[in-house]
């Protein structure tokens, strides 16, 4: 399991009540890493946050790590 996937999974599980429904998938390409986060639709707002602040913060952290490893990181939050 990669550090990117670990960070997203740990953060999401701390934000939601139904931790069993948190699924994180990592798709790695040559220059890009896509992290897909799936949570219970009823708790989607907890992961996104008010006006998308939590999602934006997560993306900022992933972007910083991505620069260090030389890849573009994309976070997709799915139902």
From Swiss-Prot:
KH domain span: 32-79
Keyword Secreted: no
GO CC, any one term: cytoplasm
Keywords carried by this UniProt record: Cytoplasm, RNA-binding
GO MF annotations in UniProt: RNA binding
Alphabetized Pfam families for the sequence: KH_KhpA-B
Main location, first listed in the record: cytoplasm
Compartments, as annotated in UniProt: Cytoplasm
Source organism superkingdom: Bacteria
Role: A probable RNA-binding protein.
Family: Belongs to the KhpA RNA-binding protein family.
Protein name as it appears in the record: RNA-binding protein KhpA
Lineage: Bacteria, Pseudomonadati, Aquificota, Aquificia, Aquificales
């Amino acid at each position: 399991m990669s550090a990117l996937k670990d960070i997203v999974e740990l953060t999401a599980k701390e934000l939601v009540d139904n931790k069993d429904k948190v699924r994180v998938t990592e798709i790695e390409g040559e220059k890009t890493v896509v992290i897909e986060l799936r949570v219970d639709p009823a708790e989607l707002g907890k992961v996104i946050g008010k006006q998308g602040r939590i999602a934006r913060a997560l993306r900022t952290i992933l972007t910083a790590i991505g620069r260090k490893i030389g890849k573009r990181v994309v976070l997709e939050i799915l139902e």
